[in-house]
């Protein structure tokens, strides 16, 4: 379902990579494709069903014989699999889309279930647009489907129209009015058009649903689907209220989220619950002080529990002395190594100008007192890039290093940005490894600025760089020069500290 949000279909290899991540995460069932839709999807379902051993694979099919047969064929190599059939049951869909009455819908559903049972005894049936289906009709078809052998009844909020108490009412009515309801697992499949997919899913659990359908990062048609990582952690954190648990390996959540984001080329919003970059970040001085004293003061989830290493304290003008001391302590400095009052005063000045301050900035303030607006050691004077065939590029850069100017041309590189970075590296000889490159448009149209944010590793330390220009190559070059200056400042700190120790 999540693939419907993408501008381009995923390859078989990409889908398999995601499926293996889901298996490692411990998901019970994964719906891996709609094999009738294309030869590529058939191949994906076939390949994944052969590789996955610890999760049950599932294939989607309409109430059409050919769909069901192809779904069964695609998963025939798997030891155990599920066929998921769907058919609309709301009056609106029956009349305007299917042109059928409810009795005909029931007949189609029963025929399709019997067809699917030829391939597997694990059948799931979705009453499409169930949340807008009259409760009497829904109860009637659910009872007949269970009698036919359907093991999982799915209640989709197909257009994200329902609010939590409505979905809870539907689920409770099924348990009250369908006599054989306990022979089947009740599932819900919620969309996020009104921003209530997760809330609806939790409400359904409280009403008796025991399967939640969703996607990693909530990607999906229109506004998306239930974000699995949010439901999973809600169940874990509020098990005292919900009284249920999952088989998920929670420490795989963050890693899986990042992999899905990367493969699908869908960045995770910084304020995204559970997996956003700000989910465990603290900027307020009061909050930072509280977290340092006891994490539970301002965090209901331990970041380690989802695969993150530690809490993130953003150093901004809102940070207090406690956060500054914490960062200095993390870098191995004792309080008598620096003057906290002077450092904090300089820190606030820098934070007002720079926005976010990093650990190496604190070192520079404490030991060489170098402000961001002072002249930098490295300054980009000129650059040019030439792209040739087969995505290869060469670059030439002129860099001011202190008072000396150096010009260097890179050898053939894999792309223009890499060519620029190689040329800069030939001048500075800093053994850096690029770990993250992010481009964000600032504004609209041809004159929009492009901001490049990069993260590199240098001698086991992380350094950030930012570049802003209308030309992406220039933004990229400026970002790397920013990194080089940050590294240079850190090197100066080390020199000063060594000199102090000699004295």
From Swiss-Prot:
Role: Catalyzes the condensation of the acetyl group of acetyl-CoA with 3-methyl-2-oxobutanoate (2-ketoisovalerate) to form 3-carboxy-3-hydroxy-4-methylpentanoate (2-isopropylmalate).
Annotated Pfam families: HCS_D2 (PF22617), HMGL-like (PF00682), LeuA_dimer (PF08502)
Region annotation (Regulatory domain) ranges: 379-503
Residues involved in Mn(2+) binding: 1, 189, 191, 225
Single GO molecular function: metal ion binding
Cofactor(s) it depends on: Mn(2+)
Record InterPro entries: 2-IPM_HCS-like, 2-isopropylmalate_synth_dimer, AIPM/Hcit_synth_CS, Aldolase_TIM, LeuA/HCS_post-cat, LeuA_allosteric_dom_sf, LeuA_bact_synth, PYR_CT
PROSITE patterns found in the cross-reference section: AIPM_HOMOCIT_SYNTH_2, PYR_CT
Primary location recorded for the protein, binned into one broad class: cytoplasm
Signal peptide range: none
Subunit structure: Homodimer.
UniProt key word Transferase: yes
Stated family: Belongs to the alpha-IPM synthase/homocitrate synthase family. LeuA type 1 subfamily.
Taxonomy of the source species: Bacteria, Pseudomonadati, Pseudomonadota, Gammaproteobacteria, Enterobacterales
Descriptive protein name: 2-isopropylmalate synthase
The enzyme's E.C. designation: 2.3.3.13
Enzyme type, top EC level: transferase
Catalytic activity from the UniProt record: 3-methyl-2-oxobutanoate + acetyl-CoA + H2O = (2S)-2-isopropylmalate + CoA + H(+)
Name of the gene this protein is made from: leuA
